[in-house]
Design a protein with these regions (language model features):
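Catalytic domains of carbohydrate-active enzymes, especially glycoside hydrolases
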Residues: 52, 155-177
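Short, solvent-exposed loop/turn segments at secondary-structure junctions
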Residues: 30-31, 134-139, 175-177
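Short beta-strand elements bearing conserved aromatic residues within extracellular beta-rich modules
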Residues: 34-36, 70
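Conserved residues at the C-terminal ends of beta-strands
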Residues: 37, 135, 172
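The feature marks proteins involved in alpha-glucan
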Residues: 1-23, 43, 51-131, 136-145, ...
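Short proline/glycine-enriched turn/loop motifs at strand-loop junctions of beta-rich domains
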Residues: 27-34, 41-43
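Aromatic- and acidic-residue-enriched carbohydrate-binding clefts of CAZyme catalytic domains
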Residues: 128, 143-146, 177-189
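Conserved, mostly hydrophobic/aromatic
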Residues: 26, 72, 132, 161, ...
Length: 189
């Protein structure tokens, strides 16, 4: 984990529901205390316990179900605390709010097997990478203060990328970030 080479940390960290509740697990080596607050406990603090090497925290919240919102309340060594979304959360509340949302991904089926088979065939071709910032690429004409969803963007973006011979996309931002005017370099998670 500490070398940055664990690519499936999302299977361990974050909120993982089962039939009776949800296991919450996060990495916070500098925290003195962490609690989880959410709809399942009327936003009252439930303690997370230090586990493993003392840098990970976890608790099981009976009754915490998919679709419910939650946040971590992280206490620093100086005694101050801050409410934080889950950096490994699978769902997020829309801005300006920042709660994470419990999601059950156990039934999700990836539909990219054709792409996965084809992707290794392109190693000898030149790269043409488009750095895409979703918030500034294009906005709906009829809703200038809003953004397209990822699904809505497909019919706009794919033809543009093909027309300009891009074969890779760097998507920014991938994580929730605190300021809509930024490019998303400062993740909230």
């Amino acid at each position: 984990f500490y070398t940055g080479k664990i690519f499936d940390a999302y299977e361990f960290l974050g909120a993982h529901p089962d039939k009776d509740g949800t296991t919450f697990r996060t990495f916070a080596p500098a925290a003195s205390r962490i609690t989880v607050i959410g709809e399942f406990n009327d936003w009252q603090e439930w303690e997370l316990n230090k586990t493993y090497d003392g840098n990970f925290w976890e608790c099981y919240a009976k009754g915490a179900k998919p679709g419910m919102m939650y946040k971590y309340r992280i206490y620093r060594q100086d005694g101050n605390c801050v409410e934080h979304c889950d950096p490994y959360g699978f769902g997020m509340e829309l801005r300006p709010n920042f709660a994470s949302i419990i999601r059950d991904l156990s039934h999700y089926k990836f539909k990219d097997s054709k792409w996965m088979q084809k992707r290794s065939v392109c190693k000898d071709k030149p790269l043409n990478i488009y750095e895409l910032h979703f918030g500034s690429f294009k906005k709906p004409y009829e809703k200038a203060d809003d953004w397209y969803t990822y699904v809505e963007m497909i019919d706009i973006l794919i033809p543009y990328l093909k027309e300009n011979d891009y074969n890779y996309i760097e998507i920014m931002p991938l994580s929730e970030h605190p300021c809509d005017e930024s490019w998303g370099y400062q993740n909230t998670g």
